[in-house]
Regions:
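The substrate-binding groove and active-site-proximal loops of carbohydrate-active enzymes
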Residues: 1-10
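Substrate-binding rim/cap in mid-to-C-terminal beta-strand-loop elements of soluble/periplasmic
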Residues: 16-25, 50-90
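Metal-dependent active-site segment of extracytoplasmic phospho-/sulfohydrolases and closely related
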Residues: 10-48
Length: 90
């Protein structure tokens, strides 16, 4: 699948094992799980690594203004996912 696909598959497996362990230990209902990310993308960081050229038409900031080191949306918003069995509805 390539590096990104491989990481996604590995993360999926590890998270599944983690969830199974919480369930087996009887603590899943008392555990709030939060997955978060770093704030904002940075491509033009002063290093010439072809990052800007390799990205093509992809917009890592999702159309938002700014980026890392910026006070605008793409620099301050942080995506996250939460799970809490029986407490947070999907």
């Amino acid at each position: 699948m390539g590096p990104r696909g491989d990481v996604i598959l590995e993360a999926d497996w590890v998270i599944g094992e983690f969830m199974k362990t919480l369930e087996q230990e009887g603590i899943l209902e008392n555990t709030l799980i939060v997955f978060s990310s770093d704030n904002g993308p940075v491509l033009n960081d002063g290093y010439y690594d072809d990052a800007v050229e390799k990205i093509g038409n992809h917009d890592p900031k999702g159309g938002l203004r700014g980026g890392k080191y910026s006070i605008f949306e793409a620099g301050t918003r942080v995506p996250f996912i939460t799970y809490w069995k029986g407490k947070i509805k999907p």
